[in-house]
């Protein structure tokens, strides 16, 4: 779709500068290399081969492998896939679709999906306009069409994505499976129950994923029969020190600063993959849930003892290489593991999360969980009676004594800082990027016209 876009300044009234006059594709390329957003595939070279090249060039540990990658990126010997998205080596060939109509309503630019992803009939009438506008992203005169070799859709609807897929895996509908559902409209937890078994060849989503993982592990015994090292790039994360690592918008690629992983550029991590173990890992809850911290939105807690409780149920265990793990191979096992280890449904874990929040804020907060420390919900509890969430610092509402959920009552009434760099809510954003785009204050801007979008012949 980027091929049919003009410069960003064409669509919005913005101050005149190097940011607002940049093409969207160039901006995305910069965002990826500076660590502002993810993009996969990562490079124009295979990740596994890249690791082996690092070893051949003398890299003896993970840090030296990372430096090898940085040096190749700086010299431009190694290129980002995002900088040449139409090159054969830079786009995937297999597309799994789940929980969304990706080829229709979820696709902004539906006609371009039909043209370039599928190579089928389309109603695209816009002319490609980006040739003389992109600077960092390579322009290919004849863009590939039909990039995908295989599209697999998990679906119980015959929607647009299913109609255009090579394989449709029939998924169970809402009344044929055990599942959990939530909404931002109220604070109750929805348990989905199977009124009837999945019909004909249908399976639940979880069982379909399980079957895919099993087939993948079997194939891996031929193609990846032993562990292999992978190189993974990750963007700078919210709720981490990296969040404040770039006080100004400098680009290491243009020499404005040094390329430092996790600071001036994306993170680089070496990960060991064992593709023969995917099925085993899919069916079992691994030790990181016990030994690490769980949580979200800057709040965390240890749940090691509750992980051990899952191991006490001998009917729901997986034994892998003579080690026992909690089983999550069946739908209800997954649901109960989630409920058991969530601060929203396990009152003791909510208390621990507030305890950790006290250390960060210096405020007294554990009283918010005192009344529910003995609450521990299971799937059968939810089926028997509607249940609400516990209070939890993961969300900003307070729901004591049947109170209706209202966002930010936690911040207003308990003086807990907002989840921003300053801890305050902001009407004005004193941020270099927002200022350059003219978005530092909320200002009305009319929608672009169909003519600007190239929708008129």
Where are these regions (language model features)?
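A glycine-rich phosphate-binding loop feature that marks nucleotide/adenosyl-phosphate handling sites
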Residues: 226-240
């Amino acid at each position: 779709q980027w091929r049919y876009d003009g410069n960003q300044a064409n669509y919005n009234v913005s101050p005149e500068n190097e940011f607002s006059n940049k093409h969207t594709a160039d901006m995305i390329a910069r965002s990826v290399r500076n660590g502002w957003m993810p993009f996969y595939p990562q490079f124009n070279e295979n990740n596994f081969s890249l690791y082996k090249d690092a070893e051949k060039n003398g890299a003896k540990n993970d840090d030296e492998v990372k430096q090898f990658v940085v040096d190749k990126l700086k010299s431009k010997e190694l290129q980002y896939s995002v900088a040449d998205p139409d090159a054969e080596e830079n786009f995937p060939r297999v597309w799994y679709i789940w929980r969304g109509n990706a080829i229709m309503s979820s696709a902004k630019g539906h006609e371009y999906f039909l043209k370039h992803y599928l190579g089928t009939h389309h109603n695209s009438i816009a002319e490609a306009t980006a040739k003389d506008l992109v600077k960092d992203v390579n322009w290919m005169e004849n863009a590939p069409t039909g990039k995908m070799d295989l599209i697999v859709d998990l679906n119980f609807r015959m929607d647009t994505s299913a109609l255009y897929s090579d394989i449709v895996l029939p998924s169970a509908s809402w009344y044929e499976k055990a599942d959990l559902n939530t909404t931002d409209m109220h604070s109750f937890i929805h348990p989905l129950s199977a009124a009837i078994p999945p019909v004909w060849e249908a399976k639940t989503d979880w069982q379909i994923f399980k079957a895919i993982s099993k087939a993948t592990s079997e194939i891996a015994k031929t193609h990846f029969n032993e562990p292999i090292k992978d190189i993974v790039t990750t963007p700078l994360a919210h709720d981490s020190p990296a969040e404040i690592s770039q006080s100004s918008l400098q680009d290491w690629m243009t020499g404005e600063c040094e390329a430092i992983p996790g600071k001036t550029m994306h993170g680089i991590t070496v990960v060991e993959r064992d593709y023969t173990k995917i099925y085993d890992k899919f069916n079992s809850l691994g030790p990181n849930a016990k030994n690490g911290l769980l949580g979200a939105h800057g709040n965390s807690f240890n749940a090691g003892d509750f992980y051990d409780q899952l191991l006490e149920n001998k009917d729901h265990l997986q034994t892998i290489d003579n080690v026992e793990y909690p089983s999550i191979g069946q739908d209800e096992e997954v649901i109960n593991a989630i409920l058991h280890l969530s601060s929203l449904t396990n009152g003791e874990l909510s208390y621990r999360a507030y305890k950790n929040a006290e250390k960060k804020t210096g405020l007294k907060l554990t009283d918010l969980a005192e009344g529910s420390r003995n609450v521990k919900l299971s799937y059968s509890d939810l089926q028997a009676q509607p249940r609400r969430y516990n209070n939890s610092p993961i969300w900003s509402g307070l729901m004591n004594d049947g109170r209706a959920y209202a966002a930010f009552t936690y911040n207003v009434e308990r003086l807990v800082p907002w989840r921003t760099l300053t801890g305050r809510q902001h009407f004005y954003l004193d941020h270099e990027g927002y200022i350059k785009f003219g978005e530092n204050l909320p200002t009305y801007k009319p929608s672009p016209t169909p003519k600007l979008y190239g929708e008129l012949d």
